[in-house]
Amino acid sequence: MATVSRKKKKVKVTPEGTVHIKASFNNIMVTITDVLGNTVSWSSAGKNGFKGSKKNTPYASQITSEAAAKEAFDLGMRHVNVLIKGPGAGRDAAIRALQGAGLEVRSIKDITPLPHNGCRPPKRRRV
């Protein structure tokens, strides 16, 4: 017998939060959390319909950030601190999209992990 799917209740959140942007070489992921670290909304380039090499473009980054920010804004979030991780192409576009969606960006922090000569990097590409 088929079960009835229930829509998850959306709970109003505090007006402050944190935006975690992970911009890798292949994809971009945006997660918006409250002050305690509980996820309020999230989005990725693949979730928004981008496939393959189009996932790592500034445009995909902009659309992804807007989608996550819009959902958080509707739940009551207004002020955010931004944490950026990774070397991806759309880092700046993601921050501009957050501001365009109505969230006030209070601080921007780059938390990209840098090795102190750790693992050997992959071989150079020959195109």
From Swiss-Prot:
Keywords: Ribonucleoprotein, Ribosomal protein, RNA-binding, rRNA-binding
Record-linked Gene3D superfamilies: Ribosomal protein S11
Assembly description: Part of the 30S ribosomal subunit. Interacts with proteins S7 and S18. Binds to IF-3.
Pfam families: Ribosomal_S11 (PF00411)
Domain of life from the UniProt record: Bacteria
GO cellular component: ribonucleoprotein complex; ribosome
MF terms (GO), sorted A to Z: rRNA binding; structural constituent of ribosome
Biological processes, Gene Ontology terms: translation
Family named by the database record: Belongs to the universal ribosomal protein uS11 family.
Chain segments annotated as coiled-coil in the UniProt record: none
Protein name: Small ribosomal subunit protein uS11
Function, as annotated: Located on the platform of the 30S subunit, it bridges several disparate RNA helices of the 16S rRNA. Forms part of the Shine-Dalgarno cleft in the 70S ribosome.
